Amino acid sequence: MCREQLITQKPRERKPKSAQQALQSLMRLCARSEKSSGDALRLMQQWQVPQAERQGVLERLVKERFIDDGRYAEAYVREKSRLSGWGARKIAMQLRQKGVSQAIIDEALGQLDSDVELPRLVEKLRRKIRTTKYTSDYELRGKLMRYALSLGFDYDIAQCAVEDSLVEQDL
């Protein structure tokens, strides 16, 4: 195919999936990785599954334990806190956007170990200091605070971590 044909070619129209096709696709997806009920609903909307049938498909997935928001939230909290170094606020916000209920989010966030949270943040801030350009200690403190807060940590924890990381760097 030449370049002009690729440019003028219209995107393929996707045929809407039936409820049965969506169920099979979601079962395959959920068998490979955890999905939330919100993820499943978004995918069904993208696949143009009829509105009336979406809830039935979701109920079947939940009944057969392909989708469990509690299990999903626990895995998400574990992954984002340990691997990505996120704080509780950012994790909770992301879970809310994925359609997980507040009660499940609160329960999943209960597994966070607050004793490990501060040392991890201090280590991330130490690495950040090495790559940050600054002209004064005041400017560096501001940049580190913004960084810690953007990771989703509470203000008190962020402030302690910034102070600890600056003391260790002799700044």
Named regions from a protein language model:
Residues M1-L171:
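An alpha-helical, amphipathic repeat domain used for nucleic-acid recognition
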